[in-house]
């Protein structure tokens, strides 16, 4: 896709303009109140950059799409959150950004930088991935500017999601989010990703131990940390669960929640897998939406699993069927008589509720309808180059 005009995008601040001293911040405070009085006042903050994703199989390009966790996350939050919940997205792109008119960036415009847009090449193997093994090799080709603390809006938020993919969410930026938001949810990939030198044709994504990063000290102030089964060993679940609730996605086995004193397994949903990119991002957004609806953490993970599974049925950021979204909201309205956000930074209910099984059954029926429609409408497409659609699977980690 040819680059879109970026004249309407705000320009990024220079690095020497973005240092915010804690003492100065505490002196002047931030705009807005600290509480979440009612659902009509709930605003979320998503921090992470939009990207260019290039999908390859067998040495050839099979897809070029909008990427970046912020795109997938805002897509689900905009679609699934209860009425009255709003969203602000802080993302950075370069002048070469090719998707300014795509749905997510159009609703939540990024900040324009001199650096090129962050770009990833995802190389898929010819063999089908197992339930837990990585099904792609990811390489960062370009990296846009980091997101600095001063890039964040100067007001309070009910919740925040730190969803960096290329190291753009700096430790001081996450700390600023924690001060602005009543509760912060973090994707582990924003904390533990490292990149080999691009100068050598590398840029390969690898992981480092969370405890060895500057982010580790912030965990006690984080509400939820999401990791894939591949990332979990680097997170150190047993240590991290004593500081915050850790959610580990386990591919077609669903997910598990670990908190200090308990854990729970949450069942998956069927899916026609075409492209696993963004499954974990969509899971985290679905989970946050569940909390906004007033579900317990374990019940909210059902909504996370549902949207993670729905996301893999299309290449790139998915377009959800309006009838499916309507059905999901009707299910939630029936389960929760009046939405009352549980993202309040103080109290979370982790255990499954008495309606958990019924909620899973209802969402599973909606998921099966999506699968049947996908198989009927798209029995053979170019998307099959990315991943087989011949059998039902469940969301990847």
UniProtKB/Swiss-Prot annotation:
GO terms for biological process: myo-inositol hexakisphosphate biosynthetic process. GO terms for molecular function: ATP binding; inositol 3-kinase activity. Keywords: ATP-binding, Kinase, Nucleotide-binding, Transferase. Expressed in roots, leaf blade shoots, leaf sheath shoots and panicles. Its EC number is 2.7.1.64. It catalyses: myo-inositol + ATP = 1D-myo-inositol 3-phosphate + ADP + H(+). The active site is at 281 (proton acceptor). Kinase that phosphorylates myo-inositol to produce multiple myo-inositol monophosphates. Participates in phytic acid biosynthesis in developing seeds. Phytic acid is the primary storage form of phosphorus in cereal grains and other plant seeds. This is Inositol 3-kinase. It comes from Oryza sativa subsp. japonica (Rice). The gene is MIK.
């Amino acid at each position: 896709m040819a680059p879109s005009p970026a004249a309407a995008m705000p320009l990024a601040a220079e690095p020497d303009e973005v240092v915010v001293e804690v003492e100065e911040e505490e002196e002047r405070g931030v705009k807005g109140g600290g509480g979440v009085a009612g659902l009509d006042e709930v605003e979320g903050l998503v921090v992470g950059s939009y990207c260019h994703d290039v999908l390859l199989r067998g040495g050839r390009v099979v897809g070029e799409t909008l990427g970046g966790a912020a795109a997938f996350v805002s897509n689900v939050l905009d679609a699934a959150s209860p009425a009255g919940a709003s969203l602000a997205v802080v993302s950075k792109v370069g002048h070469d950004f090719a998707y300014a008119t795509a749905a997510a960036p159009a609703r939540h415009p990024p900040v324009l930088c001199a650096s090129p847009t962050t770009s990833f090449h995802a190389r898929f193997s010819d063999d089908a991935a197992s339930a837990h093994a990585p099904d792609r090799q990811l390489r960062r080709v370009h990296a846009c500017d980091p997101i600095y603390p001063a890039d964040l809006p100067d007001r309070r938020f009910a919740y925040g999601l730190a969803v960096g993919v290329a190291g753009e969410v700096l430790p001081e930026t996450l700390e600023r989010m924690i001060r602005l938001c009543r509760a912060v949810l973090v994707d582990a990939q924003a904390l533990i990703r490292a990149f080999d030198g691009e100068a050598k044709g590398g840029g390969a994504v690898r992981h480092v131990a969370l405890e060895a990063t500057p982010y580790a000290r912030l965990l006690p102030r984080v509400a939820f940390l999401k990791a894939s089964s591949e990332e979990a060993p680097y997170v150190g679940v047993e240590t991290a669960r004593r500081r915050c609730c850790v959610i580990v996605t386990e591919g077609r086995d669903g997910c598990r929640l670990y908190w200090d004193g308990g854990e729970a397994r949450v069942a998956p949903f069927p899916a026609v897998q075409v492209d696993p990119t963004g499954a974990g991002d969509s899971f985290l957004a679905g989970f946050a939406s569940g909390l906004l609806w007033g579900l317990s953490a374990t019940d909210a993970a059902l909504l996370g699993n549902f949207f993670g599974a729905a996301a893999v049925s299309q290449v790139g950021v998915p377009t959800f069927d309006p009838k499916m979204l309507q059905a999901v909201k009707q299910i939630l309205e029936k389960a929760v008589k009046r939405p009352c956000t549980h993202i309040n930074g103080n109290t979370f209910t982790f255990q499954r509720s008495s309606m958990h099984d019924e909620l899973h059954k209802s969402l599973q029926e909606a998921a099966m309808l999506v699968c049947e429609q996908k198989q009927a409408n798209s029995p053979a497409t170019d998307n099959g180059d990315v991943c087989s659609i011949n059998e039902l699977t469940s969301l990847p980690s």
